[in-house]
Amino acid sequence: MVRSVWKGPFVEGSLLKKADAARASGRHDVIKIWSRRSTILPQFVGLVFGVYNGHKHVPVSVNEEMVGHKFGEFSPTRTFHGHSGDKKAKRA
């Protein structure tokens, strides 16, 4: 379900402060965030965020196509190791 337009996008307050500080300083360090639910805004383009996936911070470099999506979409929380193979097919 999509968020109401009149409410506007959700962004964690601390995330905005960190992004503004990174822009002002001009440093290109990874900004560590835990807020996977925050929406990516146009002012985040060009910055690199470390989005926490429950295990580690996955580096996400924000570009224009990501605007409007959530940070959590770009940091998978589960790893797929594949299905087990058919043992009969391997022997033949």
Swiss-Prot record:
Q: In which organism is this protein found?
A: Nitrobacter hamburgensis (strain DSM 10229 / NCIMB 13809 / X14)
**One BP term from GO:** ribosomal small subunit assembly
Q: What is this protein called?
A: Small ribosomal subunit protein uS19
Which gene is the coding source of this polypeptide chain? Answer: rpsS
Print the keywords alphabetically. Ribonucleoprotein, Ribosomal protein, RNA-binding, rRNA-binding
Q: Which family does it belong to?
A: Belongs to the universal ribosomal protein uS19 family.
Q: What does this protein do?
A: Protein S19 forms a complex with S13 that binds strongly to the 16S ribosomal RNA.
Q: Per the record's keyword annotation, is Nucleotide-binding included, yes or no? A: no
Against InterPro entries, the record matches this protein to: Ribosomal_uS19, Ribosomal_uS19_bac-type, Ribosomal_uS19_CS, Ribosomal_uS19_SF
List the GO terms this entry assigns under cellular component, sorted alphabetically: cytoplasm; small ribosomal subunit
Any one GO MF term held by the record is: rRNA binding
SUPFAM superfamilies in UniProt: Ribosomal protein S19 (SSF54570)
- HAMAP family membership: Ribosomal_uS19
